[in-house]
Amino acid sequence: MHLEDNWINAVLSKFDNDELFREAISIASHSLYQALQKRPLKNPTQVCRSLQNYINRMASRATPFGLFSFVTAGYWDEETRGSLDLTKVYRRARPDMEWIYALVKKFYRENSDFSALLVQSNSLVDLKGDRLFLKYFRFIKDKKIQTPKTISLYANRLVITIFEMAKSRLSIDQLWEKLLEVLPNLNKEKTFEVIKKLLSHQILLPGILPSLLSDSPFKELMKFLPNAVWMNELETKLSDYQSTSLGSGELSLQNLRKSMDAVVPIQSPLHVDASYKGTPIYLSNEILLKLQQAVTFLWKISASRSSQFTSLEAYRKKFIEKFGLHRIVPLKELLSEEKGLGSFLTYPQIDEKSVFDKFSQQWEKCLNKKWQESMLNHQKEIVLTEEWLNSLFELVEEELPDPCKALSSFDLFFKIQAQSIEEINRGNYQLYLSDCTWSGGSTFGRFWDLFNPEIQHELSKLAKAEKHLEKSAKVVEVSYWPSHVRNANVSVHPCLREYSLEIDNKDNSILGLEDLYIGTTHERFYITLKDGKEEILARSGNVLSYIQAPESIRLIREITLSRHLLLYPFYWAGLEEKAVFLPRVRMGLCILSPAKWNLDASSFLKDSLDIIKVKFLAWAEQWKLPDRFLMTEGDQHLLLTSKHPAHLNEIATRLKRGESLQLMEEITSEWLKSESGSHSGEFVVPFIKNSIYPYPENTRTPQAFETVKSRWMLPGSQWMYIKVYLSEEQENNFLLNKFIPFIEHLNEFISINDWFFVRYQDPERHLRFRLRIEDIHYYGLILSWLHPIGIQWMEQGLIKKIMLDSYEREVERYGGEDVMDAVESLFCVDSLAVTGLLKYFEKKEDTLETVCHILSIVSFLNGFGLDLQTKIDVLGNARQDQKLLKGFREYKNQLLKLIPALEDPNQPEEGICSVVNKFAMIRIPAQNQFLSKAQHIENSRLLEIYSHMIHMHCNRLGCDNSQETRLRLFCEHALKCCLKTSHIS
């Protein structure tokens, strides 16, 4: 108890005797500040533990946090130099964004002249039929208020008209006048109540909500508010507070808070940062060189990381399946459950391997080996070299990552571990690379106004240099008010890019969500505009995590990031959270990963706090945990010591709660000094990619968005779409012996012009039949016959169920609306040709299925009159894995004889080539019709269309995706052998 009293008294003494500390606590947690003012304390241990955590956090990391730290800009020079003069540290105070948001809400709620207020539609709202949906809300943190996950409002004609008219900002008075033009009998009072309801549900937003792409959102807001006494008073008190010297601002701060609370009372009305305007700090060019080398090393090993965008990749595969490679889809339509693919966040995390899969496996294997050796030899450090890393790539015969695919820019965080500046200049230092962002300069965005014009100019140059690396794309600054509006403090900065997308300030924004379209290539998604000419890159000049963004913003941010090979901090892969001890990892003078310890909480759950402390100290001694260490959680670091009773209590409490701990060695930084002593410094360097490595030029064919009226064929159109669910084993039997006879029976009474089928799984296995009906009045007759025969099929155990559905024609995939009828006619005759072949296979048990399938593919391509090289090019479009060639030798000789024989008219009538050609002849008229209508399509595009047709042909033959890939590769290789041996001219 005596020890506990000692540390509590020490913490309280610090608070009572240090005005700057009290001021910093008031800014960080005013509720804690108020609790400490009331003596005696109600719960001294709990209150002082909270206070101790702030002290620990201040000593742990130089993260800008109120008055616990400050920011400044430095320079590179021949040697390191500099010291701190704390009299040159200045505050910058501005209204917290949460307070600004609350002020706007109050103004709209209490304004007597409601009709003068500006409003705008919320671009995140979706209109579906007669309902409005909103899934992203802005809120002020309040435990009493529960934020809804989704709002759904009935939208009558008035609501829809209001929503559409307010897509451009206008006053409620102007909105009323426009409404009267189309709805002249409106009641004004009732209409205004509707507008108020839409504002309260965030369907409409206040038109004065300030832009976050600004030096001062508060000044922007003041332009819209009527002049009031409190404004001048607030401006004066802000100025007074900022001008007080450090250590004498507590009273001024409290007066300022009272004034702000009188206007809008919230928990944190003020946002304070500190900046240093003394003599700059200079770091040596040698340090920069070491950082560049370490970054190159880190980027190479980042190739071992599997993609973090695996849900996005699953979404992309579904996009290709539904829309193909030649269609762009409006962003908002894509995210719609009804029109597109729905939310990409609901798609599974697929097991997507790294692009550098061999290296990834080798890296993890070698890292494991080095860890085992370090444990065996009791080593506290592992040293890696560039030569060793390059040898791993050589060992697995993989090329080094392409620097053109690297990020255009990024910020690197690092610390310098050294005893003094003199030691740094002697080369006695180490650099700890702690973190990075994926956009250069983003760390500095929120501090823009704290830098001098020279530094601001350098940051502007960085944005321009980044644009030069992306010559074929528009780089767009994306901005939005986050759901927890206090986080908007991180997002305040001017726009340094030519284009912007502000979803809450459309009048200030060059682009809107409705302007964006999504397409995909074989490798990745891309964002474009309606004309499809230029790619759009969605970037952000701040460090607010895009994970918190509205889904539409998150999607475009992930699409932009997924085009790059990203940079990651060092990661121990499977060992990161499992190994009890991980040694320090170093490359030259750069610490890539400090020593780490993992402590599993499961063995402490039943123990008392006192026993947990004893067990922890024993564990710490066994695993040689230093006296001072960091407890980490994400990017939060807390400096602790095993000798401090409050720290031990914090550790024991967490373990008792079942929280496993990750501990890390402290990287000390004592060389940066002032008259008050040593200071912890964390440095951030923005990097821009070398201009000799621009991002690869976009080779995709521009796709303009087309609204195709004939894309959808609903029940009742000329196409009847029937799905028959059944087991895979029954498919051919049902197709040949049940469904085709059913169609033949129908044709005795009515005219079914054409039909075709596709095999599918979504996830249940089924056959899809599309029937083109001459007279839609036959629909009822067909269904009346389908019902009894369907019941019979179900009773026989042949099928599970039958469904009618809407047929979405894949217009872009097959060359456009002009050729779609010809494509469907070809599908119909191909269905007849394939079913003929399948019947032949049924009778000939000795037929080699693989050979027949390959010959059928070749005969399909022969029908277009393609030469040998063009056939090879079509099959090569599929980008197959060469490993699948295994087994080709078994068929090689037979294929080299049979493929040329397909074009020999003198083949035996019962021979396999004659049989394949017999059914191929059914397709020839339809193929010729397609060619006559497709003359306007360029050759490279035609090859892709042929490839898609081959995919559908293989599907009808009964091949799944892996079988099709293998068939294509065998076929391509056989054709290359034929070309080589001149069997076909």
Predicted regions and their residues:
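Type-3 copper protein
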Residues: 1-95, 157, 189-486, 524-526, ...
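Acidic, low-complexity/disordered tracts enriched in E/D and polar residues
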Residues: 52-166, 253-270, 518, 522, ...
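Segments forming glycine/polar-rich beta-alpha architectures that bind adenosine-containing cofactors
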Residues: 117-122, 127-128, 314, 318-326, ...
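Short acidic, hydrophobic short linear motifs in intrinsically disordered regions
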Residues: 169-180
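C-terminal structured domains
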Residues: 427-645, 649, 739-743, 973-985
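Extended, charge-rich low-complexity regions and/or helical-solenoid scaffolds
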Residues: 587-763, 775, 801-805, 837-844
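Long, contiguous binding/interaction regions
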Residues: 695-766, 770-985
